[in-house]
């Protein structure tokens, strides 16, 4: 530092002015560059924020129509399954155990397919990034549909002499009537909030 001061003092008056002006220019350029980089960083962050907001998943009109159609098909299979099971228990001539097994297995498979089709909708898969209504629908629909499917599976298992699944089912759902009623009401509310335009069969009773 002393050498630099000594060198500067040894310069002529004109060269001292030149050195001072040069130093000022260097400082100005450094400050300007820093501001530009800061502005670029801010712009990049703002841009990322806009992209993130724009990519927020939302249920489309097509998605809502699919939910409505799949729910109708899901409940239709449930009704058919219940009728087959009741008639088999009553030992109706047209519905023996072999017939019940074949048809109930098909019904359960179809119900699971419709369940997964709804849960595979992009906005529902990414519900944590979507609206609170979408998140609520996903949670309650999964609980409601799993209960419906398991209840049919347990009944056909009992007809086949398999009692283990009933014990598990009763432990999972200690009060089936209340569980069904509460989940039905919550799911209907979720459907109404999303404006799906579908009324669950249990809500019509």
UniProtKB/Swiss-Prot annotation:
Induction: Induced in infected host cells. Expression is regulated by PrfA and sigma-B factor (SigB). Keywords: Host nucleus, Secreted, Signal, Virulence. Coiled coil: none annotated. InterPro entries: LntA_helical, LntA_helix. Its main location: secreted. The keyword Cytoplasm does not apply. Relieves the repression of host cell immune response genes (interferon-stimulated genes) by blocking the recruitment of host BAHD1 to these genes. May modulate interferon-mediated immune response to control bacterial colonization of the host. This is Listeria nuclear targeted protein A. It comes from Listeria monocytogenes serovar 1/2a (strain ATCC BAA-679 / EGD-e). The lineage of its organism: Bacteria, Bacillati, Bacillota, Bacilli, Bacillales. The gene is lntA.
